[in-house]
C-alpha cells in the first residue's frame, strides 16, 4: 500500500517543481522583454529629437533662401541653436505653399486597450402577468370534403393474363354475293330420240349416173362403255406432276382450350401522384366495407345486377 502513495508523491513533487521553474523562466523572460522595450523606446526618442533638430535647421534655411539671405549653417550639437537664435530670426516671413507629399504607409497596429469597466446594472423590469389559457373549444364533428384528385400514380405491375372467354354467339348471315361470271360451255349432250318418219316427198330430179363426192363426216357417236384397266406401266424414278388442288373441306370442330400464356413484362413506372390531404377529426375512422381481393373468385362469371339495383355482393358504407 505504500508504493502507490510514494509514486503519487513523486509525481506531485515533479509537477510542482516544473510549475515553479516555468513561473521563474516566464518572469525572467518578461523582465528581459521589458528592458529591451525601454531601451528601444529611448533610442527612438533620441532619433526623433535629432530628426526634429535637423528639420528645424532645414526650415530656417528655406526661410532665409526665400528672403534672399544666406547664413552659414553650423552643426555644433544641441548648443549651437541657442548661439545663432538671434541671427535666425525671420524678418520678412513668406508663406510657403508646398504640395502635399504622398500618403505614407499605414503604421503598425497598436496594442488592444484595456477592457472598460462594467456598466451599471439596469433597473429591474416589471413583473409579468399570468395569462390564463382558454380551454380549447369543443368543435362539432365535421367531415371535411374530399380534396382535389392527385396526379397519376406510378404504373402498376402487369396483371396476370385472364382466362379464355367463352365463344360468342353465331354471327348474322352475310349479304348475298355478287353474281359470278358466265361459266364455260358445258359438254355436248346426248343425241335425242329418233323422230317419226316424215311424209314422203315428191320425186326428185333425174340424177346423172356416176360416183358421187364423199360427204362430210357425221356427228360423233355416243360415249362407249368403260374399258378394262390396262396393264401396269414401267417403274420410273421421276415422280409425276402434282395433281390439282382439291376443294376445301368443311370447317372442323373447335380444338381444346390452350394453356395460359407466360406472364408479360412489367410495365414502366407511372408518374407520382400528388400527396393526399389530411383532415384531423375525432369522429372515429371512416371505413369502407368491401370484400377482400383474396376472397374474390376470378374464375366464376360475375353476377349480373338485378333490375333496379345492385347485387348482394356490392359495396356498402359503414
Curated annotation (Swiss-Prot):
Pfam families, alphabetized: Col_cuticle_N, Collagen
Single GO MF descriptor: structural constituent of collagen and cuticulin-based cuticle
InterPro entries: Col_cuticle_N (IPR002486), Collagen (IPR008160)
Start-end of Pro residues biased regions: 216-228, 250-268
Disulfide bond residue pairs: none
UniProt keyword list: Collagen, Cuticle, Disulfide bond, Repeat, Signal
Lipid biosynthesis keyword on record: no
Residue spans of biased composition, Gly residues class: 309-318
Annotated GO CC locations: annular furrow extracellular matrix; collagen trimer; cuticular extracellular matrix
Region (Triple-helical region), start-end ranges: 101-130, 147-206, 209-235, 240-278
Entry's Gene Ontology BP terms: cuticle development involved in collagen and cuticulin-based cuticle molting cycle; post-embryonic body morphogenesis
Residue ranges, annotated region (Disordered): 101-318
Biased composition (Low complexity): 187-204
Entries under PANTHER family matching the protein: COLLAGEN (PTHR24637), CUTICLE COLLAGEN DPY-7 (PTHR24637:SF374)
Subunit structure and binding partners: Collagen polypeptide chains are complexed within the cuticle by disulfide bonds and other types of covalent cross-links.
Function: Nematode cuticles are composed largely of collagen-like proteins. The cuticle functions both as an exoskeleton and as a barrier to protect the worm from its environment. Mutations in dpy-7 affects the body shape.
Family: Belongs to the cuticular collagen family.
Name the UniProt record assigns to this protein: Cuticle collagen dpy-7
Amino acid at each position: 500500500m505504500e508504493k502507490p502513495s510514494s509514486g503519487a508523491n513523486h509525481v506531485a513533487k515533479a509537477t510542482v517543481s516544473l510549475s515553479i521553474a516555468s513561473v521563474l523562466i516566464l518572469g525572467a523572460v518578461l523582465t528581459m522583454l521589458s528592458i529591451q522595450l525601454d531601451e528601444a523606446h529611448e533610442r527612438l526618442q533620441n532619433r526623433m529629437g535629432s530628426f526634429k533638430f535637423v528639420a528645424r535647421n532645414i526650415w530656417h534655411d528655406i526661410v532665409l533662401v526665400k528672403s534672399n539671405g544666406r547664413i552659414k549653417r553650423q552643426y555644433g550639437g544641441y548648443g549651437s541653436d541657442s548661439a545663432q537664435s538671434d541671427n535666425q530670426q525671420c524678418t520678412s516671413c513668406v508663406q510657403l505653399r508646398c504640395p502635399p507629399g504622398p500618403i505614407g504607409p499605414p503604421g503598425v497596429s497598436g496594442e488592444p486597450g484595456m477592457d472598460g469597466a462594467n456598466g451599471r446594472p439596469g433597473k429591474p423590469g416589471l413583473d409579468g402577468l399570468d395569462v390564463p389559457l382558454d380551454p380549447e373549444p369543443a368543435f362539432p364533428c365535421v367531415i371535411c370534403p374530399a380534396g382535389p384528385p392527385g396526379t397519376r400514380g406510378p404504373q402498376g405491375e402487369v396483371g396476370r393474363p385472364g382466362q379464355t372467354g367463352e365463344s360468342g354467339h353465331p354471327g348474322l348471315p352475310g349479304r348475298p354475293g355478287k353474281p359470278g361470271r358466265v361459266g364455260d360451255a358445258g359438254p355436248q349432250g346426248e343425241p335425242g330420240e329418233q323422230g317419226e318418219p316424215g311424209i314422203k316427198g315428191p320425186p326428185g330430179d333425174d340424177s346423172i349416173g356416176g360416183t358421187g363426192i364423199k360427204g362430210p363426216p357425221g356427228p360423233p357417236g355416243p360415249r362407249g362403255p368403260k374399258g378394262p384397266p390396262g396393264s401396269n406401266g414401267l417403274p420410273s424414278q421421276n415422280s409425276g406432276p402434282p395433281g390439282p388442288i382439291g376443294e376445301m373441306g368443311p370447317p372442323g370442330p373447335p380444338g381444346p382450350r390452350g394453356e395460359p400464356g407466360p406472364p408479360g413484362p412489367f410495365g414502366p413506372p407511372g408518374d407520382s401522384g400528388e400527396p393526399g390531404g389530411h383532415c384531423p377529426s375525432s369522429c372515429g375512422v371512416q371505413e369502407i366495407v368491401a370484400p377482400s381481393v383474396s376472397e374474390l373468385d376470378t374464375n366464376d362469371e360475375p353476377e349480373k345486377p338485378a333490375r333496379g339495383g345492385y347485387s348482394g355482393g356490392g359495396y356498402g358504407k359503414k
